[in-house]
C-alpha cells in the first residue's frame, strides 16, 4: 500500500470506521473518485487530493442522484436489505412493513438506504414506495400501531404481516397499510405501540423473547418470527421495551454497561446479554434467562432457531460456547450508548 492509499484508509478509519453504518467507497483513477456518506470524510479527501495535485470527484450521499424522493417506506410484508445490488447478495438485515428508510443513493432498480438503526444496505425498489421527507414524516406520525400476528383483508386479498409491522389505525377499527390500502383485521390484532410497550415492561425479557419469537427458525439477517438471527432477536426484544440496540452482535457488545464475568452466572440478571466469539471476533449473543437455572434464550443454527438451552450443559457444543464467552452487558435502566 503506497502513501496515498494509506492516507485514504486513515480517513476511512477516522470518519467511517464501520462500513455497516456509513458509506466510504473511494478509488484512485487519475484522481480521487467515489462516494461517502460522511461530510468530514469528503472534506478530508478534498484536502488530500489538493495536496497530492489530484482531481477529486467524491460524491457526498445523498446527492442529486437521489432527487426529491429521499424516503422509502416498506410496502411489502418485509424487505430484505442486501449487501450488494444483486438478488443473490447476502441478506444483512431486514426492514419491516411500514418502516421508513433514508435513501442515500440509487442504482437502476436498487436503492442504498439507511435503516432506523443506522444500518446501511441495498434494497430493491419493488419492496418500497418512495417520497419526499414530509411524506415520510406524515406516515411516521400516523403509523403508531403495530401488527401482532395480524392478517389484513383488503379488496385485493389478504395481507399477512410480521410482528412489529407499522400501520395506521383508523377510528372505525380498520387499518391503513403503508401503500395506502385500507383493510380489516381478520386474524391476530393491531395494537398501539404505547400499549405494547407498557405490557412489555411487565414481562421479563427472556419470557418476552419466548412469547414473541419462540420456535422461530434461524435466518441470517432475519428480524421476524418467520426467521431471525441472534442479534435480530435481542434487538427486537429490547425494542419492545423502547431500548434501541445496534443490529449486529459485535455492535451491541460496544453498548450497555459491563457486567463482571462469572463462572456460574452469579451476578447476571434476567435479560442481560451474553456475548461469544468465534475466531477472535464477537459473533453471537444470547439473553440470560435468570432464575438460577443457567439457561440462555437465543437464536442459533445448531438448535434450528429460537430456543432455551443450558449454558452449563455437558454437551460439547455448550462446552465450546462457554469457553468463547467474552462479555456480559446490561441495558435495562441504563443509557444505551456506543462510547
Report the location of each language-model feature.
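Short, well-ordered loop/turn sites that connect or cap secondary structure elements
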Residues: 89, 95, 161, 267-269
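Short glycine/threonine-rich beta-strand-turn micro-motifs
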Residues: 21-46
